[in-house]
UniProtKB/Swiss-Prot annotation:
Classification via Pfam families: Ribosomal_L13 (PF00572)
Molecular-function GO term, any one: mRNA binding
Highest taxon above the source species: Bacteria
Name recorded for this polypeptide: Large ribosomal subunit protein uL13
Record keywords, A-Z: Ribonucleoprotein, Ribosomal protein
Family matches, as HAMAP family: Ribosomal_uL13
Role according to the record: This protein is one of the early assembly proteins of the 50S ribosomal subunit, although it is not seen to bind rRNA by itself. It is important during the early stages of 50S assembly.
Lineage per the UniProt record: Bacteria, Pseudomonadati, Pseudomonadota, Betaproteobacteria, Neisseriales
PANTHER family linked: LARGE RIBOSOMAL SUBUNIT PROTEIN UL13M (PTHR11545:SF2), RIBOSOMAL PROTEIN L13 (PTHR11545)
Amino acid sequence: MKTFSAKPHEVKREWFVIDAQDKVLGRVATEVASRLRGKHKPEYTPHVDTGDYIIVINADKLRVTGAKFEDKKYFRHSGFPGGIYERTFREMQDQFPGRALEQAVKGMLPKGPLGYAMIKKLKVYAGAEHAHAAQQPKVLELK
């Protein structure tokens, strides 16, 4: 018996919507990353993008545990000497709601062309409305 390997043109993708209101950042991010990779499917193949499309709504209402709301820091660098910038989780959620979730998921995906293709299937919205009603997404409940 030969080992099954998924072909890119045979992959069936579905659309799911996740309501992130009052959900913990890391728990949402791990479920999203797993579904973007396609690990929940029996035809999962590591070198083929078998994942689904994920829409996350209410990303501005994500929560973190402990004191991370004030203590968790996000860093970026301009490339110039002394050009490091930092933001706390609170500042990140105020200025760019949803970016913390995007960065958390991106860090859980493979680096390289396959990971870049996977992250494009993630759609994050700060409010309860999204622009993908035509795709008829299924509601995905998280524990």
